[in-house]
Regions:
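Beta-strand-rich cores of mature extracytoplasmic or soluble domains
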Residues: 82-85
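A short, surface-exposed interaction/processing loop segment used at functional sites
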Residues: 89-99
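Cys/His-coordinated zinc-binding microdomains
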Residues: 20-22, 77-80
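Non-catalytic beta-sheet/beta-sandwich ligand-binding modules that flank or precede catalytic cores
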Residues: 11
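Short recognition patches in nucleic-acid-associated and regulatory proteins
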Residues: 2-4, 14-17, 23-71, 88
Length: 99
């Protein structure tokens, strides 16, 4: 799903819209960071949710097939959607997507 934003406001940024309903009240539920070198099978996975930090070497769910990745899980106030915003590094490019 394509990420969409409201109009950019200098100094604040732009509000992210829910990909399901278009609402702008998305709450972070879980944040995941994946760190690894080029094409390595192992790396570091850090997950933050409900005030707790978890660390392991499991790269399952990394939005990047080769390098670093981020996932931000949201809950929408306007609909039952739980979209996941992903940021993936791939061959010098940064890809942003909703899953």
């Amino acid at each position: 799903m394509e990420p969409t934003f409201e109009q950019y406001v200098e100094g604040s940024g732009a509000l992210l819209r829910c990909p399901a309903c278009g609402g702008n009240h998305l709450h972070h539920a879980k944040i995941e960071v994946f760190d690894r070198k080029d094409d390595e099978n192992t790396g570091l996975h850090v997950s933050v949710t409900n005030g707790k930090v978890f660390e392991d070497k499991d790269l399952t769910g990394n939005p990047s097939s080769r390098r670093h990745g981020l996932s931000i899980c949201f809950k929408c106030e306007h609909c039952p959607a739980t979209p996941v915003l992903t940021i993936a590094q791939h061959k010098g490019n940064t890809w942003v997507d909703f899953k």
